[in-house]
């Protein structure tokens, strides 16, 4: 995939000595928290001519490479440039249980995780799992989007709920959970 994807690693904190090349770009960054790293990565990705989509992924998150390939294909085929793909967060010690599948904003300006504690092993859960609800936020453990659809950047430093703010500022986005 080295000709189709670029991996931008924004290292917040102590510099690492890893040469960039072969589609890998390492950026040593002041430790400005997750949002600082994500925004720095977004700025750097915007400087690369052939980059159209990015995936924000926490350093402690994991996914299958196939998830990245399918997300890329999905975004390339999306007719709406405001389409965002977010991934479910599962419990690492019990991956059949969903922690969050996006979140829904309520009138009290709070967000509530969608499909929280849904057990994906249960047959009765399949209808609930497949029922796509309009969500207003996707966590940055897996958040993929078209960089040309971004109007506002988040703070370039950590603020609790920075991913919530980013989602709220871009609420016109059509967020899809895959």
Language-model-detected regions and their locations in the chain:
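Conserved donor nucleotide-binding strand/loop of the catalytic core
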Residues: 20-36, 44
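Active-site nucleotide-sugar/metal-binding loop of Leloir-type enzymes
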Residues: 39-53
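Conserved donor NDP-sugar-binding/catalytic core segment of glycosyltransferases
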Residues: 66-112
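A recurrent flexible, glycine/aromatic-enriched loop bordering the glycosyltransferase active site
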Residues: 116-142
């Amino acid at each position: 995939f080295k000709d189709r994807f670029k991996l931008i690693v924004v290292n917040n904190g102590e510099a690492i000595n890893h040469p960039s090349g072969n589609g890998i770009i390492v950026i040593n960054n002041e430790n400005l928290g997750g949002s600082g790293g994500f925004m720095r990565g977004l700025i750097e990705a915007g400087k690369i001519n052939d980059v159209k989509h990015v995936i924000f992924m926490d350093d402690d998150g994991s996914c299958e490479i196939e998830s990245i390939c399918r997300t890329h294909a999905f975004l390339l085929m999306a007719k709406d440039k405001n389409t965002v793909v977010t991934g479910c967060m599962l419990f690492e010690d019990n991956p059949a249980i969903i922690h969050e599948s996006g979140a829904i904003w309520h009138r009290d300006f709070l967000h509530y995780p969608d499909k929280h504690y849904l057990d994906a092993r249960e047959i009765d859960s399949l209808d609930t799992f497949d029922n796509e609800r309009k969500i207003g936020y996707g966590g940055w453990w897996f958040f993929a989007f078209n960089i040309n659809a971004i109007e506002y950047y988040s703070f370039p430093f950590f603020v609790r709920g920075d991913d919530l703010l980013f989602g709220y500022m871009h609420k016109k986005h059509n967020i899809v959970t895959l």
